[in-house]
Regions:
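Soluble accessory domains appended to multi-pass membrane transport proteins
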Residues: 1-100
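Solvent-exposed, non-transmembrane regulatory segments of membrane-associated proteins
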Residues: 71, 75, 79, 85, ...
């Protein structure tokens, strides 16, 4: 039944019930996926056809990345948004793992318990370089936040001891 439907081809990057990797073989009885950890996963086609499949290689090769970054309360929102866009732009100029198909963007999305959260959106050139793109952006965020004095929160716990 899987071969009649063909939801993916060899070489496509897919997620089948949360298992992510590149399809290396589609046979009559099973499908083989090479995971990001370089492990070969064999999945029976009966299991594949009865589960949700996400094909990251269709309809386009690029992959939209959504990343949440938290900053401390009291941070200048305009400065944070500008700095995050500058970080993505700098990473895109210095690495070949990005796509220009969707313009990078930043949104202030949440007042969280200990941070103001922003979502950055950018495109990796393909699923195979998604982590490389995230790494490049994160390194630039750290560099720019340090230069501009923007602080990222970390979990803290205050313990008060009662007097006996």
């Amino acid at each position: 039944m899987l071969n009649a439907d063909m939801p993916f081809n060899e070489g496509d990057w897919v997620s089948i019930s949360g298992n992510y990797g590149q399809v290396v073989h589609v046979g009559i009885r099973s499908t083989r996926i090479m995971t990001g950890d370089n492990q070969l996963m064999t999945i029976p086609n009966a299991s594949v056809s009865s589960n949700i499949i996400i094909n990251y290689s269709k309809p386009t090769e690029y992959m939209v990345v959504h990343e949440t970054i938290g900053v401390t309360y009291g941070s200048d929102i305009a400065l944070v948004k500008r700095s995050l866009l500058d970080a993505v732009d700098s990473a895109m100029q210095n690495a070949s793992c990005f796509s220009n198909d969707v313009a990078p963007d930043v949104f202030f999305v949440e007042f969280a318990d200990s941070s103001m959260n922003f979502e950055i959106i950018f495109c990796a050139a393909s699923p195979s370089v998604k982590k490389r793109a995230i790494d490049a952006v994160n390194c630039e965020i750290d560099r720019i936040f340090t230069e501009r004095g923007i602080e990222m929160p970390f979990p803290q716990m205050v313990v008060t001891l009662a007097k006996q």
